[in-house]
Design a protein with these regions (language model features):
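Generic short beta-strand
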Residues: 24, 70-71, 117
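Solvent-exposed strand-loop boundary residues in beta-sheet-rich modules
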Residues: 30, 76-80, 123
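Short, surface-exposed binding/anchoring microloops in extracellular/periplasmic proteins
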Residues: 48-77
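Generic short beta-strand segments
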Residues: 55-58, 85-86, 120
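Tryptophan-paired
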Residues: 73-109
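Structured interaction patches on ligand/partner-binding surfaces of diverse proteins
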Residues: 114-143
Length: 143
């Protein structure tokens, strides 16, 4: 009988966890890897945001008189293209709305970041070249 109590007590102590353990991770709820159980932020937060490119009617008419294709870039990475007649919108579209070029980007360190976006023609002539601050967890419209 003493052996059963001893084994039972041993099992209880073995199953207890160390509640004093410090958990490192990301404490920012805007980050994709946010962990509410984290005690100390270790700088590992990963942020993500969607971006949609669109032309207003004036830009579509102007570019249509200049080129047959426009290419979209974010930080020198090709995102997509549109061919004449260009898709345009009178108001900012939603990210990933059909007919518009969208992309998702990731970054580290803070909940907003600066990106460089460009719009070129098929011969790599640059029509737009801008820097823009974007926020994590949102749909950012450019152009």
């Amino acid at each position: 009988m003493k052996n059963i109590y001893f084994i039972l007590i041993l099992c209880v102590f073995a199953s207890c966890s160390d509640s004093n353990r410090t958990i490192y991770g990301c404490l920012d709820p805007l980050a994709t890897n946010y962990s509410p159980n984290t005690d100390i932020d270790d700088g590992s937060c990963i942020y993500e945001s969607d971006i949609v490119f669109y032309l207003d009617a004036n830009a579509a008419v102007y570019l249509g008189s200049q080129t047959n294709q426009i290419n979209f870039f974010i930080d020198e990475s090709f995102v997509g293209y549109d061919s004449y007649p260009f898709t345009f919108s009178l108001s900012a579209p939603d990210c990933y709305q059909p007919g518009f070029i969208s992309a998702t980007i990731q970054w580290y360190e803070s909940s907003n970041t600066s990106i460089n976006w460009q719009l070129t023609d098929q011969s790599d002539n640059v029509f737009y070249d801008y820097d823009q601050i974007i926020d994590a967890g949102s749909c950012n419209q450019v152009l």
